[in-house]
């Protein structure tokens, strides 16, 4: 991939999101439709109620359009890019469905958990079919895991889409983390010569950078489940296509720790009737300790950056 193509991809995705996001914000404000705050969430987040959400709508469209025109120009509209774009859009639609219920019904819960889970599983199954149809080699350095690998794909994609969704609780947190995560995979894709994956990662980085000025504290718009579910599933898909599945556990260490904090909190409370942490996901515990959102964001971004750099360096060193 030439510097010109990379630059145009990055700038195109950035500009589409950055220039059109103000119009989307004005539209949602005019409709007086905004984020509903969970009753069990931090009381100090109540002031965020009414903030426009579903910002993921625009940054998903921006990334898809950019991948489309650059891919057509470079002759890279193939199964690999198609699988990644399908994942981004499919999980975005799942999140859009969930967000719409919350917004237009003026409630803090979307559709039922089993409905969301089923939709996520179906999306992952379709990706698995595309994955197999396109003849991608199985991961883990093995030749054929058969149905087990298909089940792993579903588990990985559903798991990380929900992990990123749980992490999206502070202004700008997931936007910054996802940018770092896609940057790490961009390096791996370029080293492996996977230009379609590199194109996708560049488009995602560009669109997230365009979204960040409107999403950092104080956020003018949230990405919503539409954005967070799409980002998590897309990261899982990229890791799968690059055959570095397990790398996401480290590159996405913050998502993993946020999810583990929720699992441990629930398990500990059921066993003892007491809370292990002040509040989960764990970023809320740091808030209750007096940390500002900017401080939490900065520390978590640094952790993500170090984890991403170490993972990439290790993979490149080991060959």
UniProtKB/Swiss-Prot annotation:
Its cofactor is Mg(2+). Disulfide bonds: none annotated. It holds the Pfam family Glycos_transf_4. It is found in: Cell membrane. GO terms for molecular function: metal ion binding; phospho-N-acetylmuramoyl-pentapeptide-transferase activity. It comes from the Bacteria. The keyword Cell division applies. It catalyses: UDP-N-acetyl-alpha-D-muramoyl-L-alanyl-gamma-D-glutamyl-L-lysyl-D-alanyl-D-alanine + di-trans,octa-cis-undecaprenyl phosphate = Mur2Ac(oyl-L-Ala-gamma-D-Glu-L-Lys-D-Ala-D-Ala)-di-trans,octa-cis-undecaprenyl diphosphate + UMP. GO terms for biological process: cell division; cell wall organization; peptidoglycan biosynthetic process; regulation of cell shape. Keywords: Cell cycle, Cell division, Cell membrane, Cell shape, Cell wall biogenesis/degradation, Magnesium, Membrane, Metal-binding, Peptidoglycan synthesis, Transferase, Transmembrane, Transmembrane helix. Its main location: membrane. InterPro entries: Glycosyl_transferase_4, PNAcMuramoyl-5peptid_Trfase, PNAcMuramoyl-5peptid_Trfase_CS. One of its GO terms (cellular component) is plasma membrane. Pathway: Cell wall biogenesis; peptidoglycan biosynthesis. The chain crosses the membrane at residues 1-21, 53-73, 77-97, 117-137, 140-160, 172-192, 195-215, 221-241, 249-269, 298-318. It is a multi-pass membrane protein. Catalyzes the initial step of the lipid cycle reactions in the biosynthesis of the cell wall peptidoglycan: transfers peptidoglycan precursor phospho-MurNAc-pentapeptide from UDP-MurNAc-pentapeptide onto the lipid carrier undecaprenyl phosphate, yielding undecaprenyl-pyrophosphoryl-MurNAc-pentapeptide, known as lipid I. Belongs to the glycosyltransferase 4 family. MraY subfamily. NCBIfam families: mraY. HAMAP family: MraY. This is Phospho-N-acetylmuramoyl-pentapeptide-transferase. It comes from Limosilactobacillus fermentum (strain NBRC 3956 / LMG 18251). The gene is mraY.
């Amino acid at each position: 991939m030439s510097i010109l193509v990379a630059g145009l991809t990055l700038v195109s995705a950035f500009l589409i999101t950055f220039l059109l996001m103000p119009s989307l914000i004005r539209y949602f404000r005019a409709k007086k439709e905004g984020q509903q705050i969970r009753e069990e969430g931090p009381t100090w987040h109540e002031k965020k109620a009414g903030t426009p959400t579903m910002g993921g709508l625009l940054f998903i469209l921006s990334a898809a359009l950019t991948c489309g025109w650059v891919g057509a120009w470079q002759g890279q509209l193939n199964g690999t890019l198609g699988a990644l774009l399908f994942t981004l859009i499919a999980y975005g639609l799942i999140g859009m469905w969930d967000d719409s219920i919350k917004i237009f019904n003026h409630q803090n819960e979307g559709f039922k958990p089993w409905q969301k889970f089923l939709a996520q599983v179906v999306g992952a199954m379709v990706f698995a079919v595309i994955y197999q149809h396109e003849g991608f080699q199985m991961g883990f350095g093995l030749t054929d895991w058969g149905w087990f690998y298909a089940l792993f794909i579903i588990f990985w994609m559903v798991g990380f889409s929900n992990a990123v969704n749980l992490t999206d609780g502070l202004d700008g947190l997931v936007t910054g983390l996802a940018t770092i995560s896609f940057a790490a995979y961009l390096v791996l894709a370029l080293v492996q010569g996977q230009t379609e994956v590199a194109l996708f990662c560049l488009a995602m980085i560009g669109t997230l950078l365009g979204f960040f000025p409107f999403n950092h504290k104080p956020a003018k718009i949230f990405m919503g489940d539409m954005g967070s579910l799409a980002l998590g599933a897309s990261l899982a898909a990229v890791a799968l296509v690059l055959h570095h599945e397990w790398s996401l556990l480290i590159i996405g260490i913050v998502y993993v720790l946020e999810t583990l904090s929720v699992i441990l909190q629930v398990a500990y409370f059921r066993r003892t009737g007491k809370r292990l942490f002040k509040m989960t996901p764990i970023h809320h515990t740091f808030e209750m300790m007096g940390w500002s959102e900017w401080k939490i964001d900065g520390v978590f971004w640094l952790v993500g950056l170090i984890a991403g750099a170490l993972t990439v360096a290790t993979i490149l060193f080991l060959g």
